[in-house]
């Protein structure tokens, strides 16, 4: 069973409330297979993996926000390209 020192993760994020929010967002990504884990899974649950990633400094709130912005931009670009193609065909 993995041992995660939450105090080390709190020090990386700043406070325990931000830690909870960041870990929950990352765990949800892992659970839905939106992204691959950045640390070995070792048969751990997504919440433990998320905390280990935060503890190692691989994930933080800024990184999560940047990923979401990039995904939104890619989605918007794809939609605009589709609309453009529809207008070109008419």
Curated annotation (Swiss-Prot):
Q: Which GO terms describe its molecular function?
A: DNA binding; DNA-directed RNA polymerase activity
PANTHER family xref list: DNA-DIRECTED RNA POLYMERASE SUBUNIT OMEGA
**Pfam family name, one:** RNA_pol_Rpb6
Q: What is its EC number?
A: 2.7.7.6
Q: How does it assemble?
A: The RNAP catalytic core consists of 2 alpha, 1 beta, 1 beta' and 1 omega subunit. When a sigma factor is associated with the core the holoenzyme is formed, which can initiate transcription.
Q: Which family does it belong to?
A: Belongs to the RNA polymerase subunit omega family.
The source's domain of life comes to Bacteria
* Catalytic reaction equation(s): RNA(n) + a ribonucleoside 5'-triphosphate = RNA(n+1) + diphosphate
Which GO biological process annotations does it have?
DNA-templated transcription
Q: Which InterPro entries does this one have?
A: DNA-dir_RNA_pol_omega, Pol_omega/Rpo6/RPB6, RPB6/omega-like_sf
Function, as annotated: Promotes RNA polymerase assembly. Latches the N- and C-terminal regions of the beta' subunit thereby facilitating its interaction with the beta and alpha subunits.
Q: What class of enzyme is it?
A: transferase
Cellular-component GO terms for this entry: DNA-directed RNA polymerase complex
What organism is recorded for this protein? Histophilus somni (strain 2336)
| Keywords from the named record | DNA-directed RNA polymerase, Nucleotidyltransferase, Transcription, Transferase
Q: What is this protein called?
A: DNA-directed RNA polymerase subunit omega
């Amino acid at each position: 069973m993995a041992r995660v020192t939450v105090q080390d993760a709190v020090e990386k994020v700043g406070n325990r409330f931000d830690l909870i929010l960041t870990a929950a967002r990352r765990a949800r990504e892992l659970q839905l297979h939106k992204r691959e884990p950045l640390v070995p899974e070792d048969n751990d649950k997504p919440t433990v993996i998320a905390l280990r990633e935060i503890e190692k400094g691989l994930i933080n709130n800024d990184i999560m926000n940047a990923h979401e912005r990039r995904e939104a931009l890619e989605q918007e670009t794809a939609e605009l390209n589709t609309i453009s193609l529809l207008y070109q065909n008419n």
